[in-house]
Amino acid sequence: MKLNDLSPAPGSRREKHRPGRGIGSGLGKTGGRGHKGQTSRSGGTIAPGFEGGQQPLHRRLPKFGFVSLKAMDRAEVRLSELAKVEGDIVTVQSLKDANVINQNVQRVKIMLSGEVTRAVTIKGIAATKGARAAIEAAGGKFEE
């Protein structure tokens, strides 16, 4: 016996439906599409969200909120992510080089999450009170 001789046991697998292939299949003639109408035609589909002329749900509900443009150029960095930066000086550019933040980020804030493993000098980056205390306790310092 070889792999090409293997076949499933008789009756264990059902044949797939082939619409429009004879009356005996149960899906002959109209192929399960019903009789006349838009959806019986080839290419006959309605647009997603179309509700037959009734005001669609996405137009019945009010608009709300907006996308803050500030969120696009600001980022938060955890204390544990500072270890990914090579060298002892951490700047916005060094965080970008270490792929910690996106290239379009301009302002960064360090959050108290994780631990500082070494003493680092932070230049031009804001930090929360807890993060500032943790960095200074590890022997690091802040420069504006």
UniProtKB/Swiss-Prot annotation:
**SUPFAM superfamilies with a match to the protein in the record:** Ribosomal proteins L15p and L18e
Ranges in a coiled coil = none
In this chain, the stretch annotated as Disordered covers: 1-57
The question of whether RNA-binding is a record keyword is answered with yes
User: What keywords were assigned to this record?
Assistant: Ribonucleoprotein, Ribosomal protein, RNA-binding, rRNA-binding
Q: Write out the GO cellular component annotations.
A: cytosolic large ribosomal subunit
- Residue ranges, compositional bias (Gly residues): 21-31
Q: Which family does it belong to?
A: Belongs to the universal ribosomal protein uL15 family.
What this protein is called in its record is Large ribosomal subunit protein uL15
State the organism named in the record: Pseudomonas fluorescens (strain ATCC BAA-477 / NRRL B-23932 / Pf-5)
Gene name of the encoded protein = rplO
